[in-house]
Regions:
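Catalytic cores of nuclease domains that cleave nucleic-acid phosphodiester backbones
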Residues: 1-44
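Short, surface-exposed loop/helix-turn segments at secondary-structure junctions
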Residues: 44-50
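Metal-dependent nuclease catalytic regions and adjoining charged, substrate-binding loops involved
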Residues: 52, 57, 62-155
Length: 155
């Protein structure tokens, strides 16, 4: 499985929408996505759930659809390499593979989502989207969290 491309954008039209994906890496049979996640330091059950809840599985199905539409019909699987943001990363790394069947099921769900999006794209009306932007700041606890860790380490 020789690598075909790293971080190459693919574009295609599907279900009446213009689509784009940017796999981190892909071969002729598999796409890959590198994730940095605090969930990599937890058990596999938690990580499996997070892969679903965070949309990583859906992203894999989307990438596969794009690669297939761009002349790579044999791309069947999607692999996630999930690494914890804090060391030791070599101990906290998971390599997860989404089966072709899993991606097929998710693709069916995404097809209905895309079809529901077409009227929104055509009219410019997106239900539930606010008209005003909410300005947010970095939480104070996040600003002091690293300082607290440094104080503990220095003691």
């Amino acid at each position: 499985q020789d690598a075909v491309a790293a971080e190459a954008s693919v574009f295609w039209a599907q279900d009446g929408l213009k689509c784009k994906a940017r796999p981190d890496w892909f071969t002729r049979t598999c796409s890959y996505d590198l994730k940095i996640s605090v969930h990599a330091s937890k058990d596999i059950g938690t990580l499996r759930y997070r892969a679903w809840a965070e949309g990583w599985m859906h992203q894999g199905a989307h990438v596969r659809a794009g690669l297939r539409a761009n002349g790579f019909p044999d791309v069947a699987k999607h692999r996630l390499v999930v690494i914890a943001p804090k060391g030791p990363s070599s101990v906290q790394t998971y390599c997860l593979e989404l089966s072709e069947h899993t991606l097929d099921v998710i693709e069916l769900e995404m097809e209905s989502i895309r079809k529901a999006m077409v009227p929104c794209v055509e009219t410019g009306i997106w239900p539930g989207t606010p008209d005003d932007w909410e300005t947010i700041e970095i939480p104070e606890s996040a600003l002091t969290a690293d300082l607290d860790e440094e104080e503990v380490a220095g003691e």
